[in-house]
């Protein structure tokens, strides 16, 4: 996933990554500072893993974030969790 957005205030790569790291729960969203490639994420159950080494800030307020995922496994895992949640409500 390649996300680019503008912030209201100036930020640094370190600030962006700190916020992403804090927000990553390790279950749905992960965060890594390891130099991995797309094939390293095959079979991961997380919906997305933020690649902190690829975070960029341009002009102080334009931020680019890259995250990786295994579409089949991540989706299947979320679907199974949703099914269990619905079943518990019945």
Residue ranges and their predicted role:
Residues 45-90:
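NAD(P)-dependent Rossmann-like dehydrogenase/reductase catalytic/cofactor-binding core
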Residues 1-63:
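C-terminal substrate-binding/catalytic lobe of Rossmann-fold NAD(P)-dependent oxidoreductases
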